[in-house]
Amino acid sequence: ALLEVQGRRGRKSTIVLLEEMLKSDCVSELTEKIQEELAEWKQYDEADSILAYIFAALMKGGLTTDDYNYRTFHAAMREKFPDYNISKGFDWAEALYNAIISEDFSYNTSISEEQIKRGRKHATDIKLRLLSIVNPNTV
């Protein structure tokens, strides 16, 4: 359910369930695939950078119901997948997401060009896997 709560320092946070963020008749299949991507990544790397890749894939693939911000997505992932130890902090992953989707160079300079290239590649690969669920003729 869409819920707005007063956050720290007076910021309003929007809380949305992951299932409500996803567009299509394949919500359960997409959620399952997102969990697979997350589980596979977390076997080898505890970093939350996978969340930036998944969110970029969803946004670039047109698989969300609205134009959500990264923080809303991060909160939805923490709520949906509590067993994966997704950190409460989101600053680095949010900066990485913004760098991945940026068309110009207006991103956080603490993110290296190599991290951005790797992030864009992962996001594209994940996007194709997610789109193949919605439309098997995609790839």
Q: Where is each model-derived feature located?
A:
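Flexible coil/loop and intrinsically disordered linker positions at secondary-structure junctions
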Residues: 1-139
